[in-house]
Swiss-Prot record:
Any single GO CC term annotated in Swiss-Prot or TrEMBL for this entry: cytosol
Secretion signal, residue range per the UniProt entry: none
Free-text comment on this protein's domains from its UniProt entry: IleRS has two distinct active sites: one for aminoacylation and one for editing. The misactivated valine is translocated from the active site to the editing site, which sterically excludes the correctly activated isoleucine. The single editing site contains two valyl binding pockets, one specific for each substrate (Val-AMP or Val-tRNA(Ile)).
One Pfam family recorded for the sequence: Anticodon_1
HAMAP family linked to this entry: Ile_tRNA_synth_type1 (MF_02002)
Motif extent ('HIGH' region): 58-68
Record-given protein name: Isoleucine--tRNA ligase
Source taxon at top rank: Bacteria
Sorted UniProt keywords: Aminoacyl-tRNA synthetase, ATP-binding, Cytoplasm, Ligase, Metal-binding, Nucleotide-binding, Protein biosynthesis, Zinc
EC identifiers of the protein: 6.1.1.5
Assembly, per entry: Monomer.
Length: 939
């Protein structure tokens, strides 16, 4: 038999079957940087509508982890998709550079006793080094951005503009100084922001403590309970606490005004307990008790008890925050160490200088504190319990495992500790309106802004709303060295800021703009204050790093990168923890400065967990490093994994999951390779066929592609990337692989190379390739560029310099789709029958079969519409269509062909050998080889 392979139009392409991503991707990255692709994209997009995704800055410390990779890849997908959608979508990456973690790194390397200016210099150098390390890894992921000109919160211009932002808050009255309990970390030696506190289980002592009644208050207490006199027994009001270390600082006792409290007679004396908790409390104390009387909490207001071991009073105050869900229903109040306690005591007139605060910054009691001076609060706990037992005030002692505040950096317990700090006020400022009369409070502005913001996923709105509604004032001052200063001068006697503070803030900002934050720390106050210098102290506090990142809408979008940006940003995108972090701080500063959020929408992604849903940790050995994935499988696989995962929940990753992603990629690549290989000899300008002259099935493929593009571009706009991956998979596997290109192979391979039928098919494939390449480019960016180069585009060109592909216009798409869906359903039934023949060993390939299809109604009409090309659609050597009256009569009859097989097209036909010169060929192949070529109308 002659070899007719060379007479076929065999597919050919330089696009390899194997991607070799890990080896080839670095070359693409280098190419993009060499030809300054980001700048070219900016130039191509100039004048389009802006879409600004503002980058939440990662902290400049340590290598990037898988969470960073997820975040940056999601951002890149969005920025690229918006660019392709016709927007000018710049991406300016940023870094958070100040703060304690970097200070700690410098202390580790150089010790704790460096001069402050030298420490700041080393911190700046360290942050710059870390940025370069992280930048290299982000670029390796294929993230396109202004990497040569990122924003850094330690840039002099950013530091200066942050001071100006602080000035705006000061000018509008949101900034105030006050004594309040704030989150305090002993290891940091500083206050913590809400976002720097995390909760972990902690085992704490749980004790019940009796405070004895003052002798001369017995009649008053009897009256409160409706009694004439009290029995001649000691009287205790009993509290329950898990923080014995706060007992030395007790200054009051809180009851709920509406709760019922009972006076209970026990062998140990008369006890005051909440009625709802009496039984459980007496069980803890192992005491029998008899209720003598009951009263509402309001009746106990201002009755005095005595501190268990110090000679001072502890009055009863009313507090709505007291609950009856645990303990005794009475809360001991140490106003220096609890926000509710502080509010309650100050409401009752307690002055700041009356609040007892013996715990020092390092967590030890002041040496002057009787019994416990010099001890750490944790070491003091058992000694305080012993002291309470010694004086007869310990009613019960045990332990409790509960969720407790910990420092996010040190993983050590933190406390509330009253210190004089600077706050951004959420409601009202002491002694004056928070803002100009008639305007809203910051809390009201922020809640309104939350309502006006679009959230992806939608549940984020309720979460952020709740956080804003319930949060305390924001403590923005820190007692640290490496940070943007709060450059105020405070009067030595009154503590009030200098009357020219706004003017002075701007003068400091101008100096910082030239010399960085050292300009403040090295400043001789006399240079700015003149003769006032003797009356004022220069502040040493620095700003919370969340204020650094939280004001980037001011310092970056309207500051260092204003020319490339837009305010407000279209989108902020971060992990779900940023509802209490960057989303939160940005919202507060935005509302304080501008009265609105600095973003139109917020998108949150979940955290990455291992294949079993467990949190990753080095100790568990389940960490997946993005660098390792890129080096082994390619960053493209990481990008595809991110896109294919529903990021609204936890993102699961493991070797097995990545292996499945590799398989998805392989299938997509093979489909694309087929498209490229079968358009290798095609030039759209030279060989393109007008859409009106395409075959019917090509029109169907075009309609499918248009439908896909509409879905995909819509999913990009809705940030639903996992749906895109699924849609591309289905299109490649089902619409193309299992149907269109399966049918198309005969026309592509066997018809004349330049026949209208083949060129029409190639034109359709070219448009499909163009559309898919652009649709996948935001996700599979390396592969899209590879395809772009293979399709004959100039080396200086890039898919990112274009927009979504403009598909040829086609009328009656809905009719075509509906008709061909009927044809596909009939074809599926034919394939089932053929598979049965194959299982019985009666046929091998489907071309060995001849079929008879019985159809009725719309199905018959659809099948009849393709005329004599039906057997091409069914991939059989012969197909007969018979009309029947009802669906019940429909069916498929199939049998092996009795004819010979053509040596070229492999169809079984009765006209084999009709040309004596080619006895092994069918008439169709003879026409295609030596005649004018066959005529195709539909397939």
């Amino acid at each position: 038999m002659a070899d007719y392979r060379k007479t076929l139009n065999m597919p050919d392409t330089p696009f390899p079957m194997r991607g070799d991503l890990a080896k080839r991707e670095p070359g693409w990255v280098a190419d993009w940087q060499a030809k300054k692709l980001y700048q070219k994209v900016r130039k191509a997009a100039a004048g389009r509508p802006k879409f600004v995704l503002h980058d939440g800055p990662p902290y400049a410390n340590g290598d990037i982890h898988i969470g960073h990779a997820v975040n940056k890849i999601l951002k890149d997908i969005i920025v690229r998709s918006k660019t392709l959608a016709g927007f000018d979508a710049p991406y300016v990456p940023g870094w958070d550079c100040h703060g304690l973690p970097i200070e700690h790194q410098i202390e580790k390397q150089h010790g704790k006793h460096l001069p402050a200016d030298r420490a700041r210099e080393l911190c700046r150098e360290y942050a710059a080094e870390q940025i370069e390390r992280q930048k290299k890894d982000f670029i390796r992921l294929g993230v396109l951005g202004d990497w040569d000109n990122p924003y850094r919160t330690m840039n002099f211009s950013n530091e200066a503009d942050e001071i100006r932002a602080l000035g705006e808050l000061f000018r509008k009255g949101f900034l105030f100084k006050g004594l309040k309990p704030v989150n305090w970390c002993f290891d940091c030696g500083s206050a913590l922001a809400e976002a720097e506190v995390e909760y972990q289980d902690k085992k704490s002592p749980a004790i019940d403590v009796g405070f004895p009644l003052v002798d001369n208050e017995r009649d008053k207490l009897a009256h409160a309970f409706g009694l004439d006199t009290l029995p001649e027994q000691p009287v205790y009001i009993v509290i329950w606490t898990t923080t014995p270390w706060t007992i030395p600082s007790n200054q009051a006792l809180n009851v709920h005004p509406e709760l019922i409290y009972e006076l209970v007679e026990t062998p140990k004396g008369l006890l005051i307990l909440a009625a709802e908790l009496r039984a459980s409390a007496l069980e803890r104390y192992q005491l029998e008790g008899r209720v003598l009387a009951a009263a509402r909490g309001v009746a106990l207001d201002r009755i005095n008890f005595r501190h268990p071991f110090y000679d001072r009073l502890s009055p009863v105050f009313l507090g709505d925050y007291v609950a009856a869900d645990a303990g005794t229903g009475i809360v001991h109040s140490a106003p220096a160490y609890g926000l509710d306690d502080f509010v309650s005591c100050t409401r009752y007139g307690m002055r700041n200088d009356e609040i007892l605060n013996p715990v020092q910054a390092d967590g030890t009691f002041a040496g002057s504190l009787p019994f416990f001076g010099g001890l750490s609060v944790w070491d003091a706990n058992p000694k305080i319990v012993d002291k309470l037992a010694e004086v007869g005030s310990l009613f019960a002692s045990g332990t409790l495992t509960h969720s407790y505040m910990h420092c996010w950096r040190h993983k050590t317990p933190v406390i509330y500790r009253a210190t004089t700090q600077w706050f951004v006020g959420m409601d009202r400022l002491p002694g004056r309106e928070a803002v100009e009369p008639g305007s809203a409070t910051l809390r009201e502005l922020a809640l309104k802004a939350v309502d006006e913001t679009q959230f992806y996923p939608a549940w984020g709105k309720a979460r952020l709303h709740s956080m804003i509604a319930n949060r305390p004032d924001w403590c923005v001052s820190r007692q640290r060295n490496w940070g943007v200063p709060i450059p105020l001068f405070l009067h030595k006697e009154t503590g009030e800021p200098h009357p020219r503070s706004l003017e002075l803030l701007e003068q400091v900002a101008q100096r910082v703009e030239q010399h960085g934050i050292d300009a403040w720390f090295k400043l001789d106050a006399a240079e700015l204050l003149g003769s006032d210098v003797a009356q004022y102290d220069k502040m040493r506090d620095t700003l919370d790093v969340w204020f650094d990142s939280g004001t980037t809408h001011w310092t970056v979008l309207r500051g260092s990168h204003a020319a490339d940006s837009q305010w407000p940003a279209a989108l902020y995108l971060e992990g779900s923890d940023q509802h209490r972090g960057w989303f939160h701080s940005s919202l507060l500063t935005g509302c304080a400065i501008d009265g609105r959020a600095p973003y139109d929408a917020l998108l949150t992604h979940g955290f990455v967990v291992d294949g079993q849903g467990k949190k990753m940790s080095k100790s568990k050995g389940n960490v997946v490093a993005p660098q390792e994935v890129s080096d082994k499988l390619g960053a493209e696989i990481l990008r595809l994994w991110v896109a294919a995962t529903d990021y609204s929940g936890e993102l699961t990753i493991s070797k097995e999951i990545l292996d499945r992603v590799v398989e998805v990629y392989r299938r997509l690549r093979n489909t694309l390779r087929f498209l490229l290989a079968n358009t290798g000899d095609f030039d759209i300008a030279r060989d393109g066929v007008p859409v009106e002259e395409w075959l019917d099935i090509d029109h169907y493929a075009l309609a499918l592609t248009r439908r896909l593009q509409e879905q995909v571009t819509g999913d990009y706009a809705r940030f639903e990337f996992h749906k895109i991956v699924q849609a591309l998979q289905n299109f490649a596997a089902e619409d193309l692989g299992a149907f269109y290109v399966d049918i198309l192979k005969d026309r592509l391979y066997t018809t004349k190379a330049d026949s209208r039928a083949r060129r029409a098919a190639q034109t359709a494939l070219w448009h499909i390739t163009q559309a898919i390449t652009r649709m996948m480019a935001p996700i599979l960016t390396f592969t899209a560029e590879e395809i772009w180069r293979v399709t004959g585009n100039d080396a200086e060109d890039s898919v990112m310099l274009h927009t979504w592909h403009e598909l040829p216009e086609l009328g009656a798409s809905d009719e075509i789709l509906a008709r061909w869906e009927l044809i596909r359903s009939a074809r599926a039934e034919v394939q089932k029958v053929l598979e049965s023949l194959r299982s019985d060993g009666r046929i091998g390939a489907s071309l060995q079969a001849e079929v008879r299809v019985r159809a009725s109604g719309a199905r018959f009409d659809a099948l009849a519409s393709v005329g004599a090309d039906l057997h091409f659609v069914l991939i059989t050597s012969r197909a007969e269509l018979v009309r029947v009256e009802t669906e019940a009569d429909e069916g498929v009859d199939a049998a092996p062909s009795s004819h010979q097989k053509c040596g070229r097209c492999w169809h079984f036909r009765e006209d084999i050998g009709v040309d004596a010169d080619h006895p092994e060929l069918c008439g169709r192949c003879c026409t295609n080889l030596h005649g004018d070529g066959e005529s195709r109308t539909h397939a």
